[in-house]
Amino acid sequence: KNIIFKHWLKSAGWWPDYQPRLFKKGHVSWKVGVHRMPDLTGKVKKLEPKPELAFVHQNYQTVEQFIERLNRYTSLQAKERLAAKAKDQDYSPSHLVKTVVREFENRAFAKEGISQGTLGVSLSLLQAFYELTISLKQWQQQGFEAEQTNPDQFTQSIKQLQKELNYWLADWHCQHQTGIKRFYWQARRKLKV
């Protein structure tokens, strides 16, 4: 159970937050990296995600604490990702905007952060900023080579992101409406308008 800003975050990808805790000696190895899961050998069993069985993790007490850790962790993750991927990463304006919007869509809508109101939406936005910061730090490590904005490509990207957001908003409304209103939002979801 992750306690963030004094609340248990049950959404936005923070619950259930499976962490291997009990394993036989010699069946686990840990590699260097931020938030890396261990490499396990042998049979793995997950416990049912019951709040009464979960460890309580007092994660972030304040926004300042989140930002401080964000700065430290994103520096490490930018190096890790650059080492793992080809050096010709995409740092175009379109890609940077997609990075933020897609992480937000994933956390707020697909992983239901919006269901926890300000807490869930705030963490969804902070996680989107986290992913953007990793990309910007990778760009920094590559020497800040600036790409010009391709107006057609950028416009196309924004239109695609608008459709995705329209889909997720309509999907959310479908879950909270009944009758004719639900039908209306189902049609909008299908059309992504």
Language-model regions, residue ranges each:
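Long, positively charged, glycine-interspersed low-complexity recognition regions
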Residues: 139, 145-193
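Catalytic-site signature of metal-activated, phosphate-bearing donor transferases
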Residues: 1-145
